[in-house]
Each structure stands twice: as structure tokens, then as C-alpha cells.
């Protein structure tokens, strides 16, 4: 679901804004889109908070023009902020995916065109810091 559609209270608004700022800390040229989907009311998208980060052009270092960031969440009515279960990032060039990393399992980056080592390391740092950001309610699986 679009990150902009997930804002239901001040705490989640703060987490969403902080997640975008955290990504931009490592990739300052990226602009954030809090509504990457035209229609995010799809039932299958209810368990994600989705962002898109667009770069000014194709970057040979990161091997893409945009990154789709999906935070897999579990909404518990008792918590004001959802639990972060996992993260999926996809490096995109229209119309195809160039690479992907998921924090469920081995945290391996796969794809046809992987980012350079420094950018790859920064993407993993973003994931680790997102778990820290949501740590008050997170069940993350990596130190």
C-alpha cells in the first residue's frame, strides 16, 4: 500500500517520514514518492508500506533509475505502529527489475545488474536502520 495511504496516526506518520529520510541519508540524490501505485487499495497490498525513490538519471553505480522499497508489516490493533516483518527493495529501469534484495532469509542480492559494492553496502545499511527505526515493535531477523 502506498506509504501516504498508511498514515493513520502521528506515530506512523513519523516512522514513514523517518524511513524516507533514512534512505536519503545514504542516497541524497533520490527523490521520494510516497504514492508509487495508482491504486493501492488492492487487498494483497494491505500488508506493505511502499515507497519509490527516483534518481535524476540512470546510475551505473546503483544500476537503476528507481528503487521500490516495500516494508512488509503486520498490523496489530493493539499497536499504533505496525510490526516490521521484512524489507524488499527492487532496483528498477522501466519496464524491468534489475536487482532485488529481501531481508527474509539470507539477505542476498540477486539480479542481472547488481549495484557497486559501496551502494550495495549502503542498501543493506538502510535495511538495518529501518529495523532499528521500527525496533520498538519489530520482529526483525538480522542483527
Where are these regions (language model features)?
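Intrinsically disordered, low-complexity regions enriched in small/polar residues
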Residues: 25, 29, 36, 53-57, ...
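Intrinsically disordered, low-complexity regulatory regions enriched in serine/threonine/proline
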Residues: 68-143
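Amphipathic, interaction-prone secondary-structure segments
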Residues: 30-86
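Charge-rich, low-complexity N-terminal segments
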Residues: 1-52
Amino acid at each position: 500500500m502506498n506509504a501516504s495511504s498508511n498514515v493513520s496516526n502521528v506515530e506512523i506518520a513519523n516512522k514513514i517520514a523517518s524511513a524516507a529520510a533514512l534512505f536519503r541519508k545514504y542516497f541524497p540524490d533520490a527523490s521520494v514518492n510516497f504514492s508509487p501505485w495508482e491504486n493501492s487499495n488492492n487487498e494483497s497490498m494491505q500488508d506493505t508500506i511502499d515507497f519509490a525513490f527516483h534518481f535524476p538519471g540512470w546510475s551505473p553505480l546503483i544500476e537503476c533509475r528507481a528503487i521500490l522499497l516495500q516494508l512488509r508489516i503486520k498490523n496489530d490493533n493493539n499497536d499504533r505502529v505496525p510490526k516490521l516483518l521484512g524489507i524488499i527493495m527492487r532496483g528498477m529501469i522501466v519496464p524491468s527489475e534489475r536487482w532485488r534484495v529481501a531481508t527474509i532469509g539470507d539477505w542476498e542480492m540477486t539480479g542481472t545488474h547488481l549495484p557497486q559494492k559501496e551502494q550495495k553496502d549502503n542498501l543493506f545499511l538502510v535495511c538495518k536502520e529501518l529495523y532499528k527505526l521500527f525496533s520498538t515493535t519489530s520482529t526483525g531477523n538480522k542483527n
